[in-house]
UniProtKB/Swiss-Prot annotation:
It comes from Rhizobium leguminosarum bv. trifolii (strain WSM2304). The active site is at residues 112, 213. GO terms for biological process: tRNA wobble position uridine thiolation. Disulfide bonds join 112-213. This is tRNA-specific 2-thiouridylase MnmA. Residues 163-165 are annotated as: Interaction with tRNA.
Length: 399
C-alpha cells in the first residue's frame, strides 16, 4: 500500500488536489509531489473574479487563484482553473440568502463541501482519471476497521484539535469519503507552515481566511438584501410574554442567542430567543429561555456501520455531539421516533440556532470517529420557555 492506501506505486496513482490558494492545500500538493504521485492542481473560480482580484485570503477568486498557479509552477505540476461561478451561486449563495429569510443562521461552508467541492469537483477528478481527490482539510480518513465494510473508509477527528474541520464535513457521503484523501489530518498547523517554507511556497506566510469567502468584510446583509429584498422588511421586537418592545429593520440582522445590537433598552438583559420569519417578529427573552437539552435534526447524514434506524431507535445511540464548531464534542444520545430525529444533550446548551450543524462522534478525543450529523431544524427549550413561545407563535399578529 502507498501512503494514500492504494495498492500500487505512487507514480501510478493520479491525485487531483483541490487548491484554494491557501497554505494548506498548497502543502498537500507539495507533499504528494514529493512522494512521487501524479499530481494535478485544480482551483475553482467560485464568485466574481473582478471584484475579488485585490482581496487576499478570500479563497477561490482573484489573488488566491494566482497564488495557486504560482505554487503549482514552483512544484512543477499542472494547474487548471474551472469556472464554477454559476453553480456556486445556485447551490451555495442563493440557499445562504434563503436560509436567512427563513430565520436561520446557515453554514455555507457545509453547502460548498456538499455540492461544488465534493460533488462537482470530485466528478471532474474522476473524469480526469484520478484515483483520489485530496484537500487541505484538517480531518483524517482511514480504512473502515469493520470486516463488514471492506474497501470502505471512515472519518476521524484530526491530530490538531484547534484546526478540527470535521464539524463542517459531517455531510460528506460514504461514496465521497471513499474517494477523498486528507493528507494534513495528522499534522499540526505549525508543521504545515514549516513545510510550506521548506518547499519555498509563496503562500508560506499567507494568513488564513476568516470570513465567509463570498462576503466582503463579513457584511453578509448586503448580499442577502440584494438577492432577497424581503429579508430587510421591518417588523416587531416582541418579548416572550407578549409585550411589543420595539421594531427592527429585518430579521436578517439577528441570530438566536444575540444580545448586543438588538436595538431596545429595557433595563433587563434580553436575548434573541426565536426568529418568526412568517410574521417578521424578533422574539426576545431572558437568557434561561435559550437553554436546551434537545435539538431536532433534518437532512441527517449517517456514517455509522449499522443503519441509522438500527442505531437510534429504542434507547437511542450513545455518542458525542458538537453543536458549535469551536466546542469539543460532549456526551449525547441520538434518537429516532415519531417526532423525528433528535439529539439529547447530557450537558445543556444555550442559543442554538436553526440552520447550524450538529456533528456526531464516537468519543470526545482527537482520534474520535465521525458518525455524520445533521442540520439543526429546531431546539426544544425548557418547559416554561417552550410553552411561552408556542403560545406567542399561535397568537394573532397585529396588522
Amino acid at each position: 500500500m502507498n501512503t494514500l492506501d492504494f495498492d500500487k506505486q505512487p507514480e501510478e496513482t493520479r491525485v487531483v488536489v483541490a487548491m484554494s490558494g491557501g497554505v494548506d492545500s498548497s502543502v498537500v500538493a507539495g507533499l504528494l509531489k514529493q512522494q512521487g504521485y501524479d499530481v494535478l492542481g485544480i482551483t475553482l473560480q467560485l464568485y466574481d473574479h473582478g471584484a475579488a482580484v485585490h482581496r487576499a485570503g478570500s479563497c477561490c477568486a482573484g489573488q488566491d487563484i494566482d497564488d495557486a498557479r504560482r505554487v503549482c509552477e514552483t512544484l512543477g505540476i499542472p494547474h487548471y482553473v474551472l469556472d464554477y461561478e454559476k453553480r456556486f451561486r445556485e447551490t451555495v449563495i442563493n440557499p445562504f440568502a434563503e436560509s436567512y429569510v427563513a430565520g436561520e443562521t446557515p453554514i455555507p461552508c457545509v453547502s460548498c463541501n456538499q455540492t461544488v467541492k465534493f460533488a462537482d469537483l470530485l466528478a471532474t477528478a474522476k473524469e480526469l482519471g484520478a484515483d483520489a481527490l485530496a484537500t487541505g482539510h484538517y480531518i483524517r480518513s482511514r480504512p473502515n476497521p469493520s470486516p463488514e465494510h471492506p474497501g470502505r473508509r471512515a472519518l476521524y477527528r484530526p491530530a490538531d484539535a484547534d484546526r478540527d474541520q470535521s464539524y463542517f464535513l459531517f455531510a460528506t457521503t460514504q461514496e465521497q469519503i471513499d474517494y477523498l484523501r486528507f493528507p494534513l489530518g495528522g499534522l499540526p498547523k505549525a508543521e504545515t507552515r514549516r513545510l510550506a517554507e521548506e518547499m519555498g511556497l509563496v503562500v508560506a506566510k499567507k494568513a488564513d481566511s476568516q470570513d465567509i469567502c463570498f462576503v466582503p468584510q463579513g457584511k453578509y446583509s448586503d448580499i442577502i438584501t440584494k438577492l432577497k429584498p424581503n429579508a430587510a422588511l421591518a417588523g416587531e421586537i416582541v418579548h416572550l410574554d407578549g409585550r411589543v418592545l420595539g421594531t427592527h429593520e429585518g430579521i436578517l440582522h439577528f441570530t438566536i442567542g444575540q444580545r448586543r445590537g438588538i436595538g431596545i433598552a429595557t433595563g433587563e438583559p434580553l436575548y434573541v430567543v426565536f426568529l418568526d420569519a412568517r410574521s417578521r417578529r424578533v422574539i426576545v427573552g431572558p437568557k434561561e429561555a435559550l437553554e436546551t437539552h434537545r435539538v431536532y435534526l433534518r437532512d441527517v447524514n449517517w456514517l455509522g456501520d449499522e443503519t441509522l434506524a438500527q442505531a437510534a431507535t429504542g434507547d437511542g445511540f450513545a455518542c458525542y455531539a458538537k453543536v458549535r464548531s469551536t466546542r469539543a464534542p460532549a456526551p449525547a444520545v441520538l434518537h429516532i421516533d415519531a417526532t423525528g430525529t433528535y439529539v439529547d444533550l447530557t450537558v445543556g446548551e444555550a442559543g442554538i440556532a436553526p440552520g447550524q450543524a450538529c456533528a456526531l462522534y464516537s468519543a470526545p478525543g482527537d482520534n474520535a470517529r465521525v458518525f455524520g450529523g445533521g442540520f439543526i431544524e429546531r431546539s426544544e427549550r425548557e418547559p416554561s420557555a417552550e410553552a411561552s413561545l408556542k403560545a406567542l407563535l399561535a397568537s394573532p399578529v397585529a396588522a
